[in-house]
Amino acid sequence: MLMNYSTLFKDNAKVAQVGIIGANGGFGYSFLAQVPRMQDSLSLRVICDLDMDVSRKLLESLKYDSSRFHPCRNQRDIEQALKTDDPIIILEDGTLLPFCKIDVLVEATGSPE
């Protein structure tokens, strides 16, 4: 069955704020490459993986706007980032995800435990 995302999201009045954990693997790359095509329904809010620099380089390679990038190491950093227009929060610590105000979290680590 082929999924037509345009049809699926057409009546959605709100843009979902999405986060991804395990972003630097193959599934994460594929997902992040698709998000800009769904900008009417999805906005990338958080990318979380073990290495912030690798995450930043991945986003740059996919042509995300680097002015949106906010490396965050604690809750205060996240609070400051959320005051900006359409931030992409970059984390290494998954325990900070609850502070990021996301609607959906994509688990792409390959180890969901």
Task: Name every feature range the model reports, one short phrase each.
Residues 1-113:
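N-terminal glycine-/serine-/threonine-rich beta1-alpha1-beta2 phosphate-ribose binding loop
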